Amino acid sequence: MIQLMLYSLIITTSIIFFNMIHPLALGLTLLIQTIFVCLLSGLMTKSFWYSYILFLIFLGGMLVLFIYVTSLASNEMFNLSIKLTLFSMFILFFMFILSMILDKTSITLFLMNNEMQSIIEMNSYFTENSLSLNKLYNFPTNFVTILLMNYLLITLIVVVKITKLFKGPIRMMS
């Protein structure tokens, strides 16, 4: 049921994204949609580790874009359209009602308060997560993990050496 709600939120933010004009509002909508996609991918893989890394990488890229947009965009305020707000609220309400109607098994499990089922599901999630992490750090793939760690360390050292701290900003002012 949560996945269905996240699908509806992703669709709603996509519709809102196409109706935005201001670059900062576009960036905020894109960031919110990224949060929803990371939550959905974490729920689907039953481990939030990969979605957390995806979110951090995307957030770093969004911060760079935010710096460029704020330096280039004009200082005009962006207005929220009442029509767009009502439309998005209607879509959210409709998707919520639709997910409640379509997902009758979740409602019956919730009403029956079946705690034993949730404990069994939790145990299967933990074993599945430990197996996926074992595959990542065991023999055939541990070389790839070590290679990626070394690549990131060397990239960090190169970036620090390229940007000289006392020489001023990287971008030349004209």
Curated annotation (Swiss-Prot):
It is an enzyme of class 7 (translocase). The gene is mt:ND6. Its EC number is 7.1.1.2. It is a multi-pass membrane protein. One of its GO terms (cellular component) is mitochondrial membrane. This is NADH-ubiquinone oxidoreductase chain 6. It holds the Pfam family Oxidored_q3. It comes from Drosophila yakuba (Fruit fly). Core subunit of the mitochondrial membrane respiratory chain NADH dehydrogenase (Complex I) that is believed to belong to the minimal assembly required for catalysis. Complex I functions in the transfer of electrons from NADH to the respiratory chain. The immediate electron acceptor for the enzyme is believed to be ubiquinone. The keyword RNA-binding does not apply. Belongs to the complex I subunit 6 family. Signal peptide: none annotated. InterPro entries: ComplexI_Subunit6 (IPR050269), NADH_UbQ/plastoQ_OxRdtase_su6 (IPR001457).
